[in-house]
Amino acid sequence: MRVNPIIDAIRFLTDSPLFYVFDLLVIASLVIVAINLQRDPAQRSIKDLSMFALRFVMGCMWWQQSLWKLPPTYTDRPDGTGGLHDWVSKMVDGAAFQIQSDFVQYIVLPHFQIFAPMVYAIEVLIGASLITGTAVRLFSLLGAAMAINLWLGLYRTPYEWPWTYVFLIAAQLLFFILDAGRSLGGDALIARRLERTHARYGLGSRILALIT
């Protein structure tokens, strides 16, 4: 059967590892959208619906990318080869700057089982954040940082197109600048609650306002 986006989407929703977690995130996202639409008529706009759609799709991309680096090996093979380990190894020769190449070769790869869970957890959290629209400002910045690492780390790798990562960086920064989580996301619910309770002046509330 010829692979096409529709078949890929169906397989992604039904055959992927942890598909049930993804389905729960989608359900949570739709519930949050419904609550926002019911409570805030101002969000019933093309702008907010479009921002939600773009944020949701980007979150799905991050979630999908986490699926080929699942624990316990964080690779796509039982023997621990391929997957994340293979792509990290490419940074030794493909990094734009020697300092990043040396860091990968002498620090990251010898301690792969320490760094791999961190990469996996961050990607899962970025995906969950963008899908549900929660703490989007924080995780958009983390997503931009991850994309910068890929851009510079794979800059000289054959057949890689560096602009791919530049566009990803730009998208993540736009989500941060435009407060994408406040368009039909969990951040909108948090912001309204802080406004309603006048609790936004406390330290914890100020931190919460910064990351949402």
Q: Which role does the model predict for each range below?
A:
Residues 1-121, 132-212:
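Extended, low-polarity transmembrane helix blocks
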Residues 125-129:
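Transmembrane-helix motifs of polytopic, lipid-linked glycan transferases
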